[in-house]
């Protein structure tokens, strides 16, 4: 384990004394450091009546137990302090370490022995081996009462609210959209879990179209056959209009009786562990599926601003700007009298996407979004540079299969009988509008491009994203991060995983950093906490994180010529190979990386260290033997070496306590293991869209074309002597349509190059 501590805030000495005393730790400057440490430990051992026993059970050094040490006249040394500190953090001497100084350096322990008051204060704010802050571990065991009142320590809210008798209720928010055009505002179901508290509390809201259930059979039937040829497109210029959102004007709302109690109780639901962690710390949890989902109204409009408006209206309700009812009759209105009006959003993938969209509405009350692996423009999810593409791991998926998956109203048989005809008409229109035939950008995609409205963002923004996320590719977070206005506070956790959550990783205090930010922004806890702009997981070693100033924006490039000759790529495969790759795209990837398919393979040995930060640009001069074509490219860190593997694996099951023995979570981490290669970046382009998205151009057979396009942005470090491998090819059996046409691309390597954005070493 290595310590990477970002949630700790420097605190004034007088405030440390006050905060410690409120927890029952009394530091006396008139006592020796040794006496203060003993008192601190005996207070920490509050679960024992006889605190001599745990002192005797612990070690001061390799020869002496702690009780004997405190009974002796020996001075407190750095070595003894570190030995005690590591035991408090659940490490075992003689098992986890034998040389405490070597272990301190190996783990990059954040505390330097000196000022004992500050040392003890920071120690309470340091993560244990099992993933909880020491103070959170002690509070979960009962250090202070569960009094349903906010308590902040080092600017972070403590778990002092009972999660076991939290209020669980349902309301139906009256939205400003009528997606099913029945003449009434769509009602949106809101599932609420909130702490019992006499005053107002903030909310964390997860906007998830999946939350009320999914229609997997319908979605599977809507998947597309990828074994089709690339379409030849007529040259033209694409035009789009500024997106419009028509909202209902509720100037004369239907009267409803105002009541103070909800009528529908919330049973068991699936929850998100970051929300679970925040609930006993005094944050209400809201789960909202939105339009077109089970127990809500309307149609599934999939990513447009009608869908986002309905989520926004929940925030409006929390701030008194929209109504909510106790049930679907709309006869009894209920206000969010428990809300302080401040909201943060959470969740990954589609959930993080809705956070991005909500932020671009500029809605008052949305203080922070935590957008984990979120989409910033839906075109870049299902299309790329004029090509129909599939998100990594999901060949054949397109927007209407996602619509089928999330339109959960059909899971209610009565809703199916009443509304399925209207839904099918809506689905058919969507199927036409997304234009799978050409892969071109159009008004449908323009209406689902949140980057156009990034200037409206007012909330503080936290992103998480993985360099190996080929589902929601890194381009999404890169574009959103760079599109935000300069005055907006923005932060990015950029890790080396795939499409995964990171709130229960051992190597970083992510959830505690979120606690510190939300406690400051939503609760008003006073602290000097500042989250860095970019927190990057160093790919060159295990459990190491660094802070950077930006993602992209580099002024230097490493320029690499591709070669000295011309080489060709054959598009067509034998029937046997084609069928084999179509059935198992993983076999295609394996052979591609080993240089065994129809491809050009180019290798470089680095002459100096490389620190890549941004989007690599591929500059090509090529020609096609026919009137169309696609080019695929992947850049690899090639050669046997230790690297992060992209899926976190459990270190210890159910050891991370989200409250007081509440929703225990697994402690996980990305393994750091020997692999033959690593994909650094990739990209795909339709030769007919080589200039820009809005231009469809002719491809004349055997005529040279010169163009550039960017591969997926990333942050990646390599050392002198490492090997870069670029593979150029046509059809990608995971991502693109699987064209069978017999044609070839010829690349002029001497007139082609690669530009890698580089930064000086951190």
Curated annotation (Swiss-Prot):
Catalytic function, reaction form: Hydrolyzes Xaa-Pro-|- bonds to release unblocked, N-terminal dipeptides from substrates including Ala-Pro-|-p-nitroanilide and (sequentially) Tyr-Pro-|-Phe-Pro-|-Gly-Pro-|-Ile
Matches recorded under SUPFAM superfamilies: alpha/beta-Hydrolases, Galactose-binding domain-like, X-Prolyl dipeptidyl aminopeptidase PepX, N-terminal domain
InterPro entries found in the cross-reference section: AB_hydrolase_fold, Galactose-bd-like_sf, Pept_S15_Xpro, PepX_N_dom, PepX_N_dom_sf, Xaa-Pro-like_dom, Xaa-Pro_dipept_C, Xaa-Pro_dipeptidyl-ppase/CocE
Pfam families attached to this UniProt entry: Peptidase_S15 (PF02129), PepX_C (PF08530), PepX_N (PF09168)
Active site (UniProt): 349, 469, 499
Signal peptide positions on this chain: none
Any one GO MF annotation of this record: serine-type peptidase activity
GO cellular component: cytoplasm
Primary location group: cytoplasm
EC numbers, comma separated: 3.4.14.11
Coiled coil: none
UniProt keyword list: Aminopeptidase, Cytoplasm, Hydrolase, Protease, Serine protease
GO biological process, any: proteolysis
Subcellular locations according to the entry: Cytoplasm
Function: Removes N-terminal dipeptides sequentially from polypeptides having unsubstituted N-termini provided that the penultimate residue is proline.
Binding partners and assembly: Homodimer.
Family the UniProt entry places it in: Belongs to the peptidase S15 family.
The protein, known as: Xaa-Pro dipeptidyl-peptidase
Organism annotation: Streptococcus sanguinis (strain SK36)
């Amino acid at each position: 384990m290595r310590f990477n501590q970002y949630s700790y805030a420097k605190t004034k000495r007088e405030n440390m004394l006050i905060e410690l005393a409120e927890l029952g730790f009394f530091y006396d400057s008139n006592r020796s450091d040794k006496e203060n440490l003993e008192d601190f430990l005996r207070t920490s051992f509050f679960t024992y009546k006889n605190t001599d026993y745990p002192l005797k059970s612990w070690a001061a050094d390799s020869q002496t137990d702690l009780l004997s040490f405190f009974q002796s006249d020996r001075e407190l040394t750095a070595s003894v302090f570190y030995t005690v500190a590591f035991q408090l953090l659940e490490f075992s001497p003689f098992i986890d370490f034998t040389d405490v100084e070597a272990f301190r350096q190996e783990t990059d322990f954040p505390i330097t022995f000196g000022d004992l008051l500050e040392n003890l204060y920071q120690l309470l704010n340091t993560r244990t081996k099992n993933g909880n802050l020491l103070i959170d571990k002690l509070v979960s065991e009962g250090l202070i009462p569960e009094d349903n009142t906010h308590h902040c320590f080092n600017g972070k809210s403590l778990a002092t609210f009972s999660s076991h008798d939290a209020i669980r209720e349902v309301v139906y928010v009256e939205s400003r959209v009528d997606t099913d055009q029945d003449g009434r505002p769509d009602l949106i179901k809101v599932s609420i879990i909130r702490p019992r508290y006499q005053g107002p509390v903030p909310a964390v809201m997860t906007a998830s179209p999946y939350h009320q259930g999914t229609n997997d059979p319908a979605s599977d039937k809507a998947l597309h056959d990828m074994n089709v040829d690339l379409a030849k497109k007529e040259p033209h210029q694409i035009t789009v209009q500024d997106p419009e959102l028509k909202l209902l004007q509720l100037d004369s709302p239907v009267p409803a009786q105002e009541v103070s109690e909800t009528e529908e109780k919330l049973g068991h639901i699936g929850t998100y562990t970051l929300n679970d962690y925040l609930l006993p710390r005094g944050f209400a949890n809201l789960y909202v599926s939105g339009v077109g989902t089970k127990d809500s109204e309307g149609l599934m409009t999939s990513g447009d601003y009608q869908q986002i408006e309905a989520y926004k209206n929940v925030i409006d309700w929390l701030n008194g700007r929209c109504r909510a009812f106790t049930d679907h009759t709309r006869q009894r209105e209920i206000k969010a009298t428990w809300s302080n009006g401040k909201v943060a959003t959470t969740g990954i993938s589609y959930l993080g996407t809705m956070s991005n969209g909500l932020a671009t509405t500029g809605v008052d009350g949305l203080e922070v979004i935590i957008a984990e692996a979120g989409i910033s423009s839906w075109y870049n999810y299902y299309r790329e540079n004029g090509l129909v593409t599939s998100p990594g791991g999901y060949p054949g998926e397109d927007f209407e299969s996602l619509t089928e998956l999330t339109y959960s109203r059909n899971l209610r048989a009565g809703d199916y009988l009443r509304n399925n005809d209207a839904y099918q008409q809506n689905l058919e229109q969507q199927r036409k509008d997304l234009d799978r035939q050409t892969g071109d950008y159009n008004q449908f995609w323009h209406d689902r491009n949140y980057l156009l409205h990034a200037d409206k963002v007012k909330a503080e923004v936290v992103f998480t994203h993985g360099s190996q996320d080929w589902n929601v590719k890194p381009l999404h977070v890169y574009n959103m991060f760079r599109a935000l206005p300069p005055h907006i506070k923005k932060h990015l956790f950029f890790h080396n995983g795939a499409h995964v959550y990171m709130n229960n990783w051992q190597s970083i205090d992510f959830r505690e950093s979120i606690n510190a930010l939300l406690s400051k922004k939503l609760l008003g806890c006073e602290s000097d906490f500042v989250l860095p702009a970019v927190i990057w997981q160093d790919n060159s070693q295990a459990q190491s994180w660094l802070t950077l100033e930006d993602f992209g924006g580099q002024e230097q490039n490493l320029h690499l010529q591709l070669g000295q000759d011309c080489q060709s790529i054959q598009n067509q495969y034998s029937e046997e190979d084609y069928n084999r790759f179509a059935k198992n795209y993983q076999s295609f990837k394996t052979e591609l990386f080993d240089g065994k398919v129809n491809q050009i393979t180019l290798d470089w040995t680095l002459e100096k260290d490389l620190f890549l930060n941004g989007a690599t640009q591929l500059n090509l001069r090529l020609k096609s033997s026919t009137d169309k074509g696609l080019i695929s490219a992947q850049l690899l860190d090639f050669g046997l070496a230790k690297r992060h593997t992209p899926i976190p694996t459990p270190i210890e099951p159910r050891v991370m306590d989200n409250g007081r023995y509440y929703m225990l979570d697994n402690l996980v981490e990305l393994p750091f293991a020997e692999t033959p290669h690593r994909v650094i970046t990739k990209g795909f382009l339709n030769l007919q869209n080589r200039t820009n998205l809005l231009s469809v151009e002719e491809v004349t057979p055997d005529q040279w074309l010169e163009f550039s396009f960017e591969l997926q942005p990333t942050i990646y470090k390599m050392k002198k002597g490492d090997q870069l491998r670029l593979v150029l090819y046509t059809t990608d059996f995971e991502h693109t349509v699987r064209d069978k046409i017999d044609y070839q691309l010829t690349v002029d390597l001497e007139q082609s190059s690669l530009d890698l954005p580089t930064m000086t070493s951190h």
